[in-house]
């Protein structure tokens, strides 16, 4: 758990902390039917109900209280979940008042700043057989709640080939002497808050803007086992040349996503 510096604050902690994930799952399917089957499979694996369970557990880990949940599966594919959260428990009377358009100023502040959401994007290449699944997740909180406490849980739950993570702290809070504090904990890398087993699984690179309190980490899975990337294909049925071709194709796709640019070779 992240330990915040003990500052004597004047009023509410107005810092907004946002942790954003962009995760990718890659596979190879050599026919149109297989590609369609993969998209259907991954769409079911990451349906709105399962994603809601993951995000509710995230709320529990960071110590947030759920105000409202919206989830939706889409046709032909994709899902979205949004959870509005607050730092302190909210009485049922106040929550029910939202349905009558009676909203206090304190609740408005929470709804504006504290939320957890996820959106999914399955897709496939029209010719090569490459299929990708992307999920965008954002955990945004205000007050003493830190989204970094859910970092390892979310990485483990999503089991991705490529992950890009951004953590940023916005705004400021004042202490009792009126001095502004633009961040309330020590950090020089998102990797500071990752478990050792995650660090051993991924190659990682940081791009941080310290003066703006913006921290960015890219992650690429180290172990590559071709068998794990084939959908409805038996590895033993592939010739050596075909295995090599598919491996190069997948490697190129993963490197392009990891570096965020097209690679010619």
From Swiss-Prot:
GO biological process: spermidine biosynthetic process
Family of the protein in this entry: Belongs to the prokaryotic AdoMetDC family. Type 2 subfamily.
Parts forming coiled coils: none
Function in brief: Catalyzes the decarboxylation of S-adenosylmethionine to S-adenosylmethioninamine (dcAdoMet), the propylamine donor required for the synthesis of the polyamines spermine and spermidine from the diamine putrescine.
Positions of the record's site feature: Cleavage (non-hydrolytic): 113-114
InterPro entries: AdoMetDC_fam_prok, S-AdoMet_deCO2ase_bac, S-AdoMet_deCO2ase_core
Post-translational modification: Is synthesized initially as an inactive proenzyme. Formation of the active enzyme involves a self-maturation process in which the active site pyruvoyl group is generated from an internal serine residue via an autocatalytic post-translational modification. Two non-identical subunits are generated from the proenzyme in this reaction, and the pyruvate is formed at the N-terminus of the alpha chain, which is derived from the carboxyl end of the proenzyme.
Catalytic activity, reaction form: S-adenosyl-L-methionine + H(+) = S-adenosyl 3-(methylsulfanyl)propylamine + CO2
GO molecular function, one term: adenosylmethionine decarboxylase activity
A UniProt-annotated Pfam family: AdoMet_dc
Pathway: Amine and polyamine biosynthesis; S-adenosylmethioninamine biosynthesis; S-adenosylmethioninamine from S-adenosyl-L-methionine: step 1/1
Co-factor binding details: Binds 1 pyruvoyl group covalently per subunit.
Residue positions, PTM Pyruvic acid (Ser): 114
GO CC, one annotated term: cytosol
Gene name in the database record: speD
Cofactor(s) listed: pyruvate
Keyword S-adenosyl-L-methionine attached: yes
Entries under PANTHER family matching the protein: S-ADENOSYLMETHIONINE DECARBOXYLASE PROENZYME
S-S bridge residues: none
Quaternary structure note: Heterooctamer of four alpha and four beta chains arranged as a tetramer of alpha/beta heterodimers.
Name this protein carries in UniProt: S-adenosylmethionine decarboxylase proenzyme
Active site: 114, 119, 142
E.C. code: 4.1.1.50
Keywords for the protein's UniProt record, in alphabetical order: Autocatalytic cleavage, Decarboxylase, Lyase, Polyamine biosynthesis, Pyruvate, S-adenosyl-L-methionine, Schiff base, Spermidine biosynthesis, Zymogen
């Amino acid at each position: 758990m992240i330990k915040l510096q003990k500052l004597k604050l004047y009023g509410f902690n107005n810092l907004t902390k946002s942790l954003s994930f962009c995760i990718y799952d890659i596979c190879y399917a050599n026919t149109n039917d297989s590609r369609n089957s993969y998209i259907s499979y991954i769409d079911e694996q990451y349906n709105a109900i399962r994603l809601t369970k993951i995000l509710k557990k995230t709320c529990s880990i960071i110590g947030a209280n759920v105000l409202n949940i919206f989830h939706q599966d889409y046709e032909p594919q994709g899902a979205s979940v949004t959870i509005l959260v607050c730092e302190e428990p909210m009485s049922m009377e106040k929550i029910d008042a939202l349905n009558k358009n009676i909203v206090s100023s304190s609740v408005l502040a929470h709804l504006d700043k504290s939320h957890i959401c996820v959106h999914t994007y399955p897709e496939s290449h029209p010719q090569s057989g490459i299929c990708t699944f992307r999920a965008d997740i954002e955990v945004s909180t205000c007050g003493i709640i830190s989204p970094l406490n859910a970092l390892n849980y979310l990485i483990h739950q999503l089991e991705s080939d490529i992950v890009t993570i951004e953590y940023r702290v916005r705004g400021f809070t004042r202490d009792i002497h009126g001095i502004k504090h633009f961040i309330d904990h020590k950090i020089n890398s998102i990797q500071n808050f990752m478990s050792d087993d995650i660090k051993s699984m991924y190659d990682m690179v940081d791009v941080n803007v310290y003066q703006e309190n913006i921290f960015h980490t890219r992650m690429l899975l180290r172990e590559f086992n071709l068998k794990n990337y084939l959908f409805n294909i038996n590895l033993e049925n592939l010739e050596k040349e075909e295995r090599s071709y598919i491996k190069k194709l997948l490697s190129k796709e993963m490197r392009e996503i990891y570096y965020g640019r097209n690679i010619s070779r």
